[in-house]
Amino acid sequence: MASMMFTDCSSTTTSRLIHLNRSSGTFLLRQCVGQLRLQTTASGRGCCIRSSSSPISSISADTKSEGGAIVIDGKAVAKKIRDEITIEVSRMKESIGVIPGLAVILVGDRKDSATYVRNKKKACDSVGIKSFEVRLAEDSSEEEVLKSVSGFNDDPSVHGILVQLPLPSHMDEQNILNAVSIEKDVDGFHPLNIGRLAMRGREPLFVPCTPKGCIELLHRYNIEIKGKRAVVIGRSNIVGMPAALLLQREDATVSIIHSRTKNPEEITREADIIISAVGQPNMVRGSWIKPGAVLIDVGINPVEDPSAARGYRLVGDICYEEASKVASAITPVPGGVGPMTIAMLLSNTLTSAKRIHNFQ
């Protein structure tokens, strides 16, 4: 039995995974990306690729593969989504004179958090979304943060609010996140959004960005979810649990593996789809994987590498070298889920602006 130590693995607004770490939005246009139909043969080892008849055949033809597995290119998909968002932002501005706005609150001077905020601002600029930012000192009071949240809640030019995590230890993180207006909770962390996600017949206003990005990758590559066995490794509120809920909503049969799970490799070997989000480098080995399975790797883990310029390289939770020889499709690390997280944040912000202004 494998020994497992799970951590909170998030590639969204948190930076808990590593120090360097890194809706229900309905804006899910798929016609511009190569839709790959992945079909396992009777033996489960083969992978047949058919490109759709849409204008994406050129992307399908350029699809990369490694060790027999299709490489699910998160960078390419995220770029397509940003292009779609750019068009919609421009259309909204021209039609009703409204530009979607995203506000970020950063507390403290963590370099990794500052990098994430800078990347989000750059992403907003690239699609025409306005960005607002408040920076507070590490020793700021919780009341000061709540005041900033309240100000953005009341600002009609702000359609999405994001509190950069982690917050200083003297602050009640949940209390601050709960203060964000649910209509502007583009991170999807508000308990009411998660509660709606968990209930049949209810729709959350927003879905957390990283799990939403995972499912969107499956959609964009036309990978069937309905009726499939899916395993989510990790049960964090940020990635694992909402990812499991999303898969369940799409009629997959879902199992969750966590630090108390016995014989995780046996459970994982039954899965057609695996989403791993635990922050343990190369934990999932090739022997854990059912031939022909589809693998979505959320983990971003630094491992020492003297040959690398920075002295380390980034790897996922899944041993890529082994898994790519068994799976039918796999996300790389980096370049898989990471780019999708910010793309989904932009998508959620656009969705919020459209909803608030009743723009179709």
From Swiss-Prot:
Q: Catalytic activity, per the record?
A: (6R)-5,10-methylene-5,6,7,8-tetrahydrofolate + NADP(+) = (6R)-5,10-methenyltetrahydrofolate + NADPH; (6R)-5,10-methenyltetrahydrofolate + H2O = (6R)-10-formyltetrahydrofolate + H(+)
* Pathway of action: One-carbon metabolism; tetrahydrofolate interconversion
Instruction: Give the UniProt record's GO annotations in the biological process aspect.
Output: photorespiration; tetrahydrofolate interconversion
User: Which EC number(s) are documented for this chain?
Assistant: 1.5.1.5, 3.5.4.9
Q: Which Pfam family, any one, appears in the UniProt record?
A: THF_DHG_CYH_C
HAMAP family, per the entry: THF_DHG_CYH
> What name has this protein been given in UniProt?
Bifunctional protein FolD 4, chloroplastic
> What is the organism field in this record?
Arabidopsis thaliana
